[in-house]
Design a protein with these regions (language model features):
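Immediate post-signal-peptide N-terminus of mature secreted/exported proteins
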Residues: 18-54
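Enrichment for repetitive, rod-forming helical segments
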Residues: 9-10, 44, 127
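Compact alpha-helical subdomains of small soluble proteins
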Residues: 19-23, 54-144
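Sec-dependent N-terminal signal peptides
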Residues: 4-13
Length: 144
């Protein structure tokens, strides 16, 4: 579990370390080749899925013996947020996510939005949750 957490933290730090150096997330994203973008999205999907499954297994191990235990809301919410980053409609065709992220970063209002947050908005849109995706996009535009 610690290995996964360390890998996840290194992954996040690498993504967000681009911002202090003056490099915008959109410049980072648009500077990648198409195959690098697909690999990036594939890696992010894999890391999020692994993190979620590992957490489920650890919770199961910890509370397996307690029959009165009920899963708290914050754990369900954590899983829901993790699912927002993964598009089920796109399936294994990650090129769709890449093309939509390119389109998202084409708008100058979105240049400062972090790459993972952009992936979250695109995944929500792909899954048909347009209202939620638009609300999240407006929040991110206001924040960044």
């Amino acid at each position: 579990m610690r290995k996964i957490l360390v890998i996840w933290l290194i992954f996040i730090m690498n993504i967000y370390s681009e911002i202090p150096s003056g490099k915008l997330p959109s410049v980072f994203w648009l500077g990648l080749s198409d195959s690098e973008k697909v690999s990036f999205v594939n890696g992010a999907y894999g890391a999020i899925s692994l993190l979620k499954n590992s957490h489920k297994n650890e919770v199961r191990k910890q509370y397996l013996h307690n029959k009165n235990w009920i899963q708290p809301y914050y754990i369900e919410r954590f899983y829901d947020i993790a699912d927002e980053y993964l598009s089920e409609e796109a399936g294994y065709n990650l090129k769709i996510i890449v093309l939509h992220m390119d389109a998202l970063y084409a708008n100058s209002d979105n240049h400062k939005i972090p790459v993972l947050e952009a992936m979250r908005v695109v995944s929500l849109m792909q899954d048909g949750l347009r209202d939620k995706a638009n609300l999240r996009l407006l929040q991110l535009q206001r924040k960044y």
